[in-house]
């Protein structure tokens, strides 16, 4: 089924945990196209596999910051990245009174005309003192124990009962941490459950780290790794602008049309994925097809021709089988080396088939369309 998820002051993953709990289902059965900001008032489509329509509505009226809207049966699940964009209503506060409406309007229109740096924001990194990319870095290195310890590490802003449970883990009392960790801390409880079940070895070291991570939803594990990719991307983009300026330069990447042979390969991959989607597992989890964006590095002749703008410049997320911009390759290596990651970033598999996958290069400069229109997702709230 597909339904509209409306939330505020709640992470997407936490909202889906609550939906699964009230529907008496598993979190792994729910999928979505992208995470939404915790601090925003957001609405997005979510799909759920073999979850009754009537069970989804049970969440309404139970949690003040979470509602679900109309639900209907669909043929395919949503997949991460399966969206063309987001629609925002943005509120700007504390604007100086001395600024005229004309000045404010011109500033807003400039966003649409000139664009803005396409940074990843807090929805990718989280809002706690232990960001998602810190866990992702450990996963990419295969440091399973480090990843578990990072997930369970104390953080600023924890409620007293959560802080107590985290401290018990640090003190080596896994059983006590499991006992005191509140039930709504699902990911921490899932990790602790496996760690306590598998116990310690003769040297007193916990042995279940890899299995504990495998107990987490696949989408959460990939989110951790995507967080690290995004962290590197943000730093590379900042370095690119600081050192090379606000105009295209030699070595920047731009998209080029695929050749006939490349287009045929893409069509064959899509057809193969469609054929594979006939199986029950494919219907449940979806089959992701990576359609390569063909790029090339700008030359001195390209710069002299002045045919490219900053909006044409693409910057790839780090991963395997990636074409990096020659003018920033050293910066990618430098940033990842700080975290103990070599340039062979995730050439192999991560825990439970988790890999840092190839991805579309992202525009360095993002554009904004200013056009008033009604919300694209209807929301109808019904309380039981």
Language model region names:
Residues 1-384:
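Non-catalytic, substrate/partner-engaging modules appended to enzymatic cores
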């Amino acid at each position: 089924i597909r339904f509209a998820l409306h939330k505020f002051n709640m992470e997407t993953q936490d909202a889906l945990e609550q939906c699964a709990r009230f529907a008496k289902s598993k979190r792994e059965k729910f999928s979505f196209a992208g995470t939404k900001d915790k601090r925003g008032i957001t609405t997005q489509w979510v799909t759920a596999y073999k979850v009754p329509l009537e069970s989804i509505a049970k969440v309404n009226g139970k949690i003040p910051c979470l509602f679900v809207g109309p639900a209907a049966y669909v043929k395919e699940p949503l997949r991460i990245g399966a969206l063309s964009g987001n629609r925002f209503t943005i509120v700007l506060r504390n604007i100086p009174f001395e600024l005229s409406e004309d000045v404010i309007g011109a500033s807003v229109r400039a966003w649409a005309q000139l664009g803005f740096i396409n940074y990843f924001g807090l929805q990718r990194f989280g809002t706690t003192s232990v960001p998602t990319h810190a866990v992702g870095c450990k996963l990419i290195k295969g440091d399973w124990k480090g990843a578990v310890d990072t997930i369970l590490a104390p953080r600023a802003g924890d409620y007293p009962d959560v802080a107590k449970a985290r401290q018990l883990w640090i003190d080596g009392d896994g059983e006590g941490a499991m006992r005191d960790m509140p039930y709504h801390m699902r990911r921490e409880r899932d990790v602790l459950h496996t760690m306590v079940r598998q116990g310690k070895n003769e040297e007193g070291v916990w042995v279940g780290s890899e299995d504990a991570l495998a107990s987490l939803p696949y989408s959460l594990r990939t989110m951790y790794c995507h967080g690290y990719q995004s962290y590197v991307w943000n730093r590379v983009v900042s370095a690119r602008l600081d050192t090379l300026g606000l105009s295209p330069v030699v070595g920047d990447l731009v998209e080029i049309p695929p050749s006939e042979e490349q287009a045929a390969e893409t069509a064959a991959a899509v057809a193969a994925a469609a054929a594979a989607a006939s199986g029950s597992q494919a219907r449940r989890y979806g089959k992701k097809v990576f359609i390569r964006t063909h790029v090339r590095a700008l030359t001195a002749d390209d710069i002299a021709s002045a045919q490219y703008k900053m909006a044409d410049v693409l910057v790839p997320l780090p991963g395997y089988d990636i074409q990096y911009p020659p003018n920033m390759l050293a910066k990618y290596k430098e940033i990842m080396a700080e975290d103990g990651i070599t340039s062979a970033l995730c050439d192999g598999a991560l825990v439970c088939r988790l890999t840092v996958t190839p991805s579309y290069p992202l525009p360095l400069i993002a554009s904004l369309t200013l056009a008033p229109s009604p919300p694209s997702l209807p929301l109808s709230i019904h309380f039981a």
